[in-house]
Amino acid sequence: MLKFLKPKSSDEGSSKDNKSAASLKEFLDKAREDFKQRWENPAQNTACLDDFDRIKTLGTGSFGRVMLVKHKQSGNYYAMKILDKQKVVKLKQVEHTLNEKRILQAIDFPFLVNMTFSFKDNSNLYMVLEFISGGEMFSHLRRIGRFSEPHSRFYAAQIVLAFEYLHSLDLIYRDLKPENLLIDSTGYLKITDFGFAKRVKGRTWTLCGTPEYLAPEIILSKGYNKAVDWWALGVLIYEMAAGYPPFFADQPIQIEKIVSGKVKFPSHFSNELKDLLKNLLQVDLTKRYGNLKNGVADIKNHKWFGSTDWIAIYQRKIEAPFLPKCRGPGDASNFDDYEEEPLRISGTEKCSKEFAEF
């Protein structure tokens, strides 16, 4: 059982602290073993297209689409990510796509979307993920306007735990934004879209991510590390609680703002929230929370999270502040409608070399 460390001031508290720190370490050590096993022996071709009925498109992207499908044998609903191999190659996303599949088949955490099957045919790559019927945080946030601080904190805590898990496996996520956060029928989060995730020991240099969420060190083409995810968490918490992001990266002047680290806070932000955000949206890496010698503990022990029971969040025992409207397991009404296109599968195999390991 995982006990996430919770600050206590008394001596009794500190011995409890040591216990939870120890069991956290134990949990993460075991998670590392499990991950390593799957990372080094990735599963391949665990299903085929004929195993599924395709129902409707849930989303589209530059080299594919995500469809709601029903597994014929089990009757379970899934979200099937379909990527056109030739488009992936053309857009130079081979490495990212192979990374995504390899990572998804190896990770296992309550707040990360789970991949159940993967396979390929002559034309496409397929990743079959659990279907999260509540839709994207993005659409709920835009509809509601902004989330209260307790509501924002509930989601932020899940992301902190998910990043703690990923970072302990040397994985950087690199694409945090409300569009990549799904809300399940119980009101808890699932992080999806591992297209930019990467296993990095030390530093990496790739320019990728979403402009508004890019850390200064990525924009400045410096080598960067996991600290970029903690910066993005700051941007996300700000956007959840304000209803708009701290930076709009549509003009060069806005990019300069990110690099300068100047952030204005709405007057309704609490002092605790402003303090946490100043420490996450910190341009100086030697001062950014999550990147200091105490690691994630600086974030988890911050007073804005003072009321958070990390263990209960991990166990999904806290009542969610908001439940999406869901009418059963295959209900896609929380997703937008898209034009449907027939799946074209070539008679000859495309890009077999590039995707041999998929």
From Swiss-Prot:
Q: Which residues bind ATP?
A: 58-66, 81
Reactions catalysed, semicolon-separated, are: L-seryl-[protein] + ATP = O-phospho-L-seryl-[protein] + ADP + H(+); L-threonyl-[protein] + ATP = O-phospho-L-threonyl-[protein] + ADP + H(+)
User: What does its activity-regulation comment describe?
Assistant: Binding of cAMP to kin-2 regulatory subunits induces dissociation of the heterotetramer. The released catalytic subunits are active and able to phosphorylate their substrates.
Instruction: Mark out the compositionally biased spans (Basic and acidic residues).
Output: 8-19
Please name the GO terms of the biological process aspect recorded for this protein, alphabetically: signal transduction
Which GO MF terms are attached to this record?
ATP binding; cAMP-dependent protein kinase activity; protein serine kinase activity
Top-rank taxon: Eukaryota
Cellular component, GO, one term:
cAMP-dependent protein kinase complex
Q: Keyword Kinase on this protein?
A: yes
Domain spans labelled Protein kinase? 52-305
User: Where is the catalytic site?
Assistant: 175
Q: Ligase: is it a keyword of this entry?
A: no
Q: What is its EC number?
A: 2.7.11.11
| InterPro entries the record matches | AGC-kinase_C, Kinase-like_dom_sf, Prot_kinase_dom, Protein_kinase_ATP_BS, Ser/Thr_kinase_AS, STKc_PKA
Alphabetically list the UniProt keywords: ATP-binding, cAMP, Kinase, Nucleotide-binding, Serine/threonine-protein kinase, Transferase
Record's Pfam families? Pkinase
Renumbered to this chain, region (Disordered) spans 1-22
Q: PANTHER family per the record?
A: CAMP-DEPENDENT PROTEIN KINASE CATALYTIC SUBUNIT 1 (PTHR24353:SF153), CYCLIC NUCLEOTIDE-DEPENDENT PROTEIN KINASE (PTHR24353)
Q: What does this protein do?
A: Essential for larval development. Controls the rhythmic contraction of enteric muscles probably by regulating G-protein coupled receptor aex-2-mediated calcium influx in GABAergic DVB neurons. Plays a role in the control of oocyte meiotic maturation by gonadal sheath cells. May play a role in the regulation of neuromuscular junctions.
The annotated subunit structure for this chain is: Heterotetramer composed of two regulatory subunits and two catalytic subunits.
The entry's family comment says: Belongs to the protein kinase superfamily. Ser/Thr protein kinase family. cAMP subfamily.
| Name used for this protein in its record | cAMP-dependent protein kinase catalytic subunit
Lineage of origin: Eukaryota, Metazoa, Ecdysozoa, Nematoda, Chromadorea
